[in-house]
Amino acid sequence: MADNQSVLSVSIVTPDGQVYNEQGDLLIVTTKSGQLGIMPNHVPVIASLEVEEARIKRGENEDEIAVNGGFLEFSGNVATIVADSAERQDDIDVNRAENARERAEATIKKAQEAHDADTLARAEVALRRAVNRINVAKH
């Protein structure tokens, strides 16, 4: 639990380990219901997350993390995001993300032509993840 009642403790974890663990003034995430901003002393919440960036404002600075699905749990000024995968802005390889986007777009085209709904759904998720990583890296 964060000791100071005027800050949030924000942690982002994936199956590969902890990606982020800092204190901040404001956490902004995109849930299945829309964008959610959490400040210190917010009511407890559990929410399912979209493939989108998580932004953590820390004074004049802002950290951006590409979060690929998962959920958020917030209680007692502690926010924990458990994500399928997540990358800090500085850790994103833009060329790799661009290549992933191109592969996903090509797979989508082939799946549409073949009327392959399963492959299409997987490729659309891959495209959202690649675009998310590119957007976070370029901010």
Swiss-Prot record:
Gene3D superfamilies, A to Z: ATP synthase delta/epsilon subunit, C-terminal domain (1.20.5.440), F0F1 ATP synthase delta/epsilon subunit, N-terminal (2.60.15.10)
Keyword flag Protein biosynthesis: no
Membrane topology designation: Peripheral membrane protein
Top-rank taxon: Bacteria
GO cellular component, one term: proton-transporting ATP synthase complex
Keywords attached to this entry: ATP synthesis, Cell membrane, CF(1), Hydrogen ion transport, Ion transport, Membrane, Transport
Chief location bin: membrane
Pfam family, one: ATP-synt_DE_N
Claim: Transport is one of the keywords in the record: yes
Compartment(s) of residence: Cell membrane
Disulfide bonds: none
Molecular function terms from GO: ATP binding; proton-transporting ATP synthase activity, rotational mechanism
Alphabetical list of InterPro entries matching this protein: ATP_F1_dsu/esu_C_sf, ATP_synth_F1_dsu/esu, ATP_synth_F1_dsu/esu_N, ATP_synth_F1_esu_C, ATPsynth_dsu/esu_N
Similarity section: Belongs to the ATPase epsilon chain family.
Free-text function comment from the UniProt entry: Produces ATP from ADP in the presence of a proton gradient across the membrane.
NCBIfam families reported for this sequence: ATP_synt_epsi (TIGR01216), PRK00571.1-3 (NF001846)
Subunit structure: F-type ATPases have 2 components, CF(1) - the catalytic core - and CF(0) - the membrane proton channel. CF(1) has five subunits: alpha(3), beta(3), gamma(1), delta(1), epsilon(1). CF(0) has three main subunits: a, b and c.
Name listed for the protein in its UniProt record: ATP synthase epsilon chain
